[in-house]
Amino acid sequence: MLVLGLETSCDETGVALYDSERGLLADALFSQIDLHRAYGGVVPELASRDHVKRMLPLIRQVLAEADCVPTEIDAIAYTAGPGLVGALLVGASCAQALAFAWGIPALGVHHMEGHLLAPMLEEQPPQFPFVALLVSGGHTQLVRVDGIGQYELLGETLDDAAGEAFDKTAKMIGLNYPGGPEIARLATQGVAGRFVFPRPMTDRPGLDFSFSGLKTFALNTWQQCVSAGDDGEQTRCDISLAFQQAVVETLTIKCKRALKQTGLKRLVIAGGVSANKALRASLEKMLAEMKGNVFYARPEFCTDNGAMIAFAGCQRLQAGQQESLAISVQARWPMEQLSAL
């Protein structure tokens, strides 16, 4: 089965072609980072307009790269949520229109299920069951995964997502958007131990997260440094390191608890923050000590992309899942509501 995947949940326009027998044939991505940088974050209306501008050229690019014509495509998968409604509607409308014109089915895919399954595009994919850490700008969740659509939520953030906390903290100390990569970059030049930030909710049982207090702690630390006239580049580096260490250690502690609670030895990390090198190193060390394995997607498939949507859609379409031509998207969509295959 040959599936065209379309991703437009936020500020990246992603298109890909995935074949159930040959694997990923082509993928293309346009990031809107430069467009939103001047505003310090994503502007929904601008995101939607840019998706409209980029979608068809990217589809043509992917078809040309794969040497494919529309008559060869068996189905279209598109991100139906969660995400920005206007942005989602661009992808959904395009998918349904093309599906109607080409006489093929279109299927809405859950954005986070796409992220969760992205490591399966690698040469050594994880086997079910496993624990997944979904960590991005909008989500921080621990999920037990027994199969596609068989998801048990173990814990989630009670306020800010980890990626959101990265971006907001970066903005508070004067770094550019997107803040996560900027903090990671400065952290490599930080002096360890100058600042020590708390590891939120690790002193109590449970698998939930909270990052709003950590963000406030970072802000107070920065304001104290500014008041003392110590607001130079090295202080930004030191705060970045302390903040990143706190987030990474918190996520690692919670992942270890989840693995012990479930008795599993396989961990998948997915979502934009999973590209963070410090997080990967920490989880790899923890899994090595537990004699387990950690899996993640290649860096370009950690952030939003069309390949993960094409793959996830292909799995569901092959299992017989169908959808009407109605255009329906959801800004909020709990993954536990998905049907099992």
UniProtKB/Swiss-Prot annotation:
Instruction: Return the similarity comment.
Output: Belongs to the KAE1 / TsaD family.
What's its job? Required for the formation of a threonylcarbamoyl group on adenosine at position 37 (t(6)A37) in tRNAs that read codons beginning with adenine. Is involved in the transfer of the threonylcarbamoyl moiety of threonylcarbamoyl-AMP (TC-AMP) to the N6 group of A37, together with TsaE and TsaB. TsaD likely plays a direct catalytic role in this reaction.
Name its co-factor(s): Fe(2+)
Compartments (UniProt record): Cytoplasm
Q: Name one GO molecular function term.
A: iron ion binding
Q: Which PANTHER family match?
A: TRNA N6-ADENOSINE THREONYLCARBAMOYLTRANSFERASE, TRNA N6-ADENOSINE THREONYLCARBAMOYLTRANSFERASE, MITOCHONDRIAL
Query: Which Pfam families does this chain map to?
Result: TsaD
Entry-linked HAMAP family: TsaD
Q: What is the name of the protein in this document? A: tRNA N6-adenosine threonylcarbamoyltransferase
User: Which principal EC class is assigned to this enzyme?
Assistant: transferase
The reply on keyword tRNA processing is yes
Instruction: Report the domain of life of the source organism.
Output: Bacteria
EC?
2.3.1.234
CDD domains noted in UniProt: ASKHA_NBD_TsaD_bac
Q: Which UniProt keywords apply?
A: Acyltransferase, Cytoplasm, Iron, Metal-binding, Transferase, tRNA processing
Q: Does the keyword Ribonucleoprotein apply?
A: no
Q: Which gene encodes it?
A: tsaD
Q: Which species expresses this protein natively? A: Pseudomonas fluorescens (strain ATCC BAA-477 / NRRL B-23932 / Pf-5)
Reactions catalysed, semicolon-separated, are: L-threonylcarbamoyladenylate + adenosine(37) in tRNA = N(6)-L-threonylcarbamoyladenosine(37) in tRNA + AMP + H(+)
One GO BP annotation is: tRNA threonylcarbamoyladenosine modification
Instruction: Cite the binding residues for substrate.
Output: L134, V135, S136, G137, G138, D167, G180, N276
Q: List the record's Gene Ontology CC terms alphabetically.
A: cytoplasm
Q: Which residues bind Fe cation?
A: H111, H115, D304
Cofactor: bound how, per the entry note? Binds 1 Fe(2+) ion per subunit.
